[in-house]
A protein has these predicted regions:
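A short acidic, Gly/Pro-enriched loop at the edge of an enzyme's catalytic core
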Residues: 103-114
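Conserved class I S-adenosyl-L-methionine
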Residues: 143-175, 183-185
Length: 275
């Protein structure tokens, strides 16, 4: 059976997190972005001393904030980034690490009280199958939070056009050697992300709504985050995008109900409850 994994993409992420291990990420900024993702997460339905998993944990930046809130957290990643996560989370005693892929991670089925996968499952060949693999590990009534790249279904055609142009650059940059790839993605962060985000910040302070400005999401972020996300966006070989309806359909097909979407950036972030 063909595995639901793209090894070139896995290797790319290992390189990314080795370079951007998040040690330079300000704590307050990490919490700000964390709250963006978890604003819709139903903490109140978790049982006492919950056990869950972080699928595609990367450097462990979200696990670092989740682990203190739960009894145990499984950090799962198929790439060498897991070594970075082990280092970053070394002071936490309630975390375990599994260097495994989404279609074969060894957690027992129907054993977890919650799960999440943020910015990961759009980088596997079959996203729908990957979501099903995640939900198979959940107990009935357990929440699953996912963040998948949106297909600009809530944006103007202009956004879609910009993405199509940028995707041409991604296809070229993503096949470059690591060092050259970093040069190009850092340049994009400096000449594209930084100006647009700072212009958005100035306009917002003047009372202007900036949601329609590309990359305005980064107006409160550091240049370090921009470099990280530029590397993620332009340096990754496999990328898929989905509409809200497509994500909802995949989640329902995976046995999730009461699906809720965040109406704020980043899009789309959704949570559902295992039936």
């Amino acid at each position: 059976m063909k595995k639901n994994i793209d090894q070139t993409t896995v290797k790319s992420f290992g390189d990314e997190w080795d370079r951007f291990d998040q040690s330079s990420l300000p704590e307050e900024e990490a919490e700000y972005v964390f709250n963006k993702y978890f604003s819709i997460f139903p903490w109140h339905i978790l049982p006492e001393n919950p056990i869950g998993f972080d699928l595609g944990c990367g450097s462990g930046r979200w696990a670092k904030l989740i682990a203190p809130k739960v009894a145990h957290l499984h950090c799962i990643d198929p790439s060498s980034a897991l070594n970075i996560a082990k280092k970053n989370l070394s002071e936490l005693t309630n975390v375990s690490f599994l260097q495994e892929s989404v279609d074969s991670f060894s957690i027992e089925k129907e054993s977890q009280d919650f799960g999440y996968s943020l910015g990961v499952l759009h980088h596997v060949p079959d996203t729908s199958l990957a979501i099903k693999s995640c939900t198979s590990k959940l107990k009935s009534g357990a929440p699953f939070l996912v963040y998948l790249y949106y297909d600009f279904d809530n944006r103007s055609p202009f956004f879609k056009f910009i993405w199509r142009v940028s995707d041409l650059f991604r296809r070229m940059i993503s096949i470059m050697p690591p060092r050259l790839k970093h040069v190009f993605t850092d340049a994009i962060a400096f000449f594209v992300y930084l100006p647009l985000s700072r212009i958005s910040k100035v306009l917002e302070k003047s009372g202007v709504r900036v949601d329609s400005i590309p990359l305005s999401f980064y107006r409160h972020n550091s240049f370090y985050t921009m470099r990280t996300d530029s590397r993620d966006r332009f340096g990754t070989p496999l990328e898929q995008r989905f509409t809200r309806k497509e994500i909802e359909k995949m989640m329902e097909s995976a046995g999730l109900k009461d699906i809720t979407f965040s109406e704020e950036t980043p899009f789309w972030c959704a949570v559902g409850i295992k039936t």
